[in-house]
Structure formats: structure tokens, C-alpha cells
Amino acid sequence: LVDTEEKRTELLQNLLTKEIFSLDTETTGTDPITAELVGMSFSYAENQAFYVPVPADRTEAQKIVNEFRPAFEKEGALKVGQNIKYDMLVLGNYGTEVRGPLFDTMVAHYVLQPELRHNMDYLAEIYLHYQTIHIEELIGPKGKGQKNMRDLSPEAIYKYACEDADVTLKLKNILEQELKTNDAEKLFYEIEMPLVPVLAYMERNGVRVDTEALKQTSEHFTARMNQIEEEVHQLAGTDFNIASPKQVGEVLFDKLRIVEKAKKTKTGQYVTSEEVLESLRGKHEIVGKILEHRGLKKLLGTYIDALPLLINKETGKIHTSFNQTVTATGRLSSSNPNLQNIPIRNEDGKEIRKAFIPDDGCEFFSADYSQIELRIMAHLSGDANMIEAFKEGDDIHAATAAKVYKISIDKVTREQRSKAKTANFGIIYGISVFGLAERMNVDRKEAKELIDGYFETYPQIKEYMDKSIDLARGQGYIETIFGRKRYLPDINSRNSVVRGYAERNAINAPIQGSAADIIKAAMVRIYQRFQSENIKSKMILQVHDELNFSVLPEEKEKVQKIVIEEMENAYHMQVPLRADCGWGSNWLEAH
């Protein structure tokens, strides 16, 4: 327990001589942008750790953080943390940067075992066979009565905090070796670790939201829902609660009898899931209206009415959290709000994007990869026909249609192009004849002809798909172009449904995972150039294959040049990477 100025000075002097130390912050909450420091712990040798309490008084707290600033900002020292992005953001609240190389034990484990849990209590158990003190033992279970770390004395906290720093350092020593053994060093040190400060910077930047626009959309949607409800009641000839699946089932299947045999759950209730209703859309006009009502309700609840509540009082912005250790494929995910799930297919979903706006006096800039997954497929399979189409700069869907239907590219109809597009995207996800027929609303015969024609056109893609499955069968995992592994234990399952799912992953995970690797590499390069060229504009959001920026008018040309250059040169393949971009006064316009 380091609770005097003398002890602090001694600890700092020690830290400054070390090449490696772990750090951990104890705070008043889980949201790093608003959290206040309660204490900091450090460890530079196994079984030895130090806890520095930080008082509630802001001036005093700032003084203590400043004392340790030389250690945090020492370029040469490796900083080790468990979810270190959180600690970086908290220290950032006190104007302190964590500089130099990083090692995040949570991300290291994610790179090794993407499907497992990565929290420290779990890692300590499996790697150190050690039971950590759980936070609940200090502050009580989640809920109303839960205490705050601030309410506890330093004496009550220091063992827990020191343990965190010590365990983190021990885990690093083990995981470092594991990364070596598993050939995951390049991915970890060149992509995932340099990405950590980039994500911290994006979360710190936050994004502005047009609350006025959301309010209007909310009123507009609510009015529409009320109208739809009236229409539905009229069509049903009775008033009922649209939000109740039970009542919807009774109206559709008992009263209106829109199908002979309706699916029921174990409890004898009718199934009225999205899927079921979608398949019944053509049977009665009431179905489409119920679906529309549900869609609006979800948008209102998840985004339109929820976004204003997520605005940070101090900054006036929303600071989404980017999660680097969640998806099995290597993509980023985000929470509070989840940006990856904003529906863009339909007009209503687009209303949400309209509410995301740039900083005052700035413009919104959006850049996204054009057909990156198909390009990766062309590269991985080495298919000469597809590579040629991309090199010629052809519209890939039209080129596919021309080849499959054996006509010249200028004769391709819109419908043929649309079918080829469905095939292009469906087939790389390992879609079946049945699945394709359903998605395109055609019979199975036509779907089968399309798939056969597709593989005739791109024979090496079929080879690649078969090879991927064989490889996964043999070694139990697949890899992306940067060597990210995805384990597929079900690939040899006796159950054909389970096995089929693993087989589709064997085909798609290398493609989706490589796309994730590439955009991460691009983000790191853009961030580094923004820093070295002193760009004041900001990268604010990442969604799938798209990056979004808030840009100062005088930096427009410079930013566009940097972003497109770095996105297109993030990785060199047999086909060029292409990025499209747009400008606007909000996300929707720019996209």
C-alpha cells in the first residue's frame, strides 16, 4: 500500500528503471469516459505489486496522477494491462497518455482462443490455477445496493488491486510464449496492439447526435405505428395487442386462418417470429403491416429513443465502446450503442444514420471498402476469371451475370445482375440450393442452374471452398491472411446440421476474418498518419468495412487522400483493394 508521498516517490523511481510493468486502475464506474480514479496498481516482478490510492478531491487526484506521468509516458517501457484501453481512457481523463508498446492480456487470449471468455478471473483460473478475489466480494452483487469503490478504504481495496496487477503480469509471461508457439505474434504485435490506442482515441472523440432530428423521427414513427395499428385492427376485424406474439398468433391462425397448419411452440402457442411472418408475407396484407410495426418499434426502442439517453452530459456526444475481443471472426463490435446493427437496408433504418453529425463547423466523411469480401475470395482462390474482372475494373455483379448467362456485359438486365449479386454474396457464405431459391424467390431448379453456372464461371472458387473444408477437417481450424485462427471443433460432427454450419464457417471465416484484419491495419495506418501529419480532423466510427470521420473544411483534401491511400494499400493482393467515399452534413448523406 503506497499511501505517502515518500512511498510514491520511491515506487516511481523504481518504475522508471523497469523495461516492463503492469498497470491497473480502480475507478468509480465501468464507463471510462465518466469514471474517476480511486487508485492505481503496478507490478514489475511476479508476486510483488503496489497500490496507490487516489483521493476524491480532484486537485489532489490530479497531483498524484501527475507524479506518475513520467512512468506512463516512458516510450521505451512495455505497459501490460488486462483490457488496457479502459485504463488508458481513465488516465486520459487526467490528461495523461500511456505511451510506448502495449501488451493486453485480454486481447492476447482473444487472438489465441477467440471463442472463449477472456475476463481475468477466468484466465487466472485456466493459466495460473488461481482463484482471484471477485469484485463482488468488495462491493456486493450487481443491483441497487451495490457499493462504489470510492466507498471503501484503501486498506479494503489494496489486496484486490495488487492482485489484479500481479495476475496480469503473470498472465503476460505465459501468454507471450503462447503467442510465439501459435504463430500469432505478427497479428498481435502488428495489428491488435497498435489498434488499442486507435480505439481509445475514437471512443474519446465520440460522435455528435442531432437530438432535434431524433425527436422529429420519434414523433413521425409513433404516428405511423398508431396508424398501422388501426389498419391492422380493421383488417383483423378486432382490436388486439400487436406487441403480444400470443394475440398475433391467434388472430392470424385462428381468426383469419391464413395457413392450414401453423407452427406451434412446445407450450402450444403459435410461432410468430420474424422468419415465420416473412414467409407468410404474401398470404395476407396484414402480415406486412405487423412486420412494419415491429420494425418501427425496434428502431424506436433500440436507437431513436435510446440514443439521446446515451449522450454524455459533459461532452455532449455519444461515446460508443469498441470491443476488440468479442466476435469469433476478428471483426470489431460496439456497444452503447451497437452501431454494427443499425439496419441500412430499409428507408426507416436510414433515418437513424441521419442523426449522426460531425463536430461544429466540420463535415462528415465516410469511406468504405468496395466488395472487399469478394476481392478476398478472388485473392484466396486465385480464380483467374474473377481476378480478371476485378482488374478490368468491371462491375463484378454484371460481369458475373454476363459469364453465367453467357451474354455480353452490356446485354445484362437489372434482374440478371441482381440474381448474380445474390449468388456472389450467397455462395461465399456457403449457401445451399434451397437457401438461394428462397432468397431469390425462384424455384430450386433455377437456383441449382445458377449455382452450377457460377462454379463453371469461377471453377477455382469451388476448389477453394472444398479445400477450405478439407483443411479445417484436418487441422481443426482455419486461418486468415494475417494468420488469425478460428477453431471449428464441429467440422467432424456426426450431426449434418451442426457439421454444415462448421463447413460454411470454414469457407467464410477466412474471408470475413481477413476483411477484419485489413480494415484494422488500415485504421492503424490512418491514425499514425493523422498524428505524424498533425491532422486535427478525427476518425470517429468504424462499422464493418466502413470508416467515418469528422473533418475540418481546410483539411478535406488531405484527409480524403490519406484515408483512401491507406485503405487501398493496407494489404497487397492479386486484385486491387478499392475504397469509395462520400461527404455530407451527416452520416446518411456521406454514405
Regions inferred by a protein language model and the residue ranges of each:
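Conserved "right-hand" nucleotidyltransferase catalytic core of DNA-directed polymerases
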Residues: 1-56, 70-73, 82-84, 98, ...
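Metal-dependent catalytic core segments for phosphate chemistry
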Residues: 20, 27-60, 121, 366, ...
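Short, conserved charged micro-motifs
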Residues: 61-63, 244, 554-561
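A short alpha->loop->secondary-structure connector
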Residues: 92-102, 116-121, 383-387
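Conserved beta-strand -> loop -> alpha-helix junction used to position metal-binding or nucleic-acid-contacting
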Residues: 97-113, 127, 393-397
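Conserved catalytic core of nucleic-acid polymerases
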Residues: 147-150, 197, 204, 259, ...
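Short beta-strand
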Residues: 241-243, 538-543
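A common structural junction motif
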Residues: 457-459, 565-574
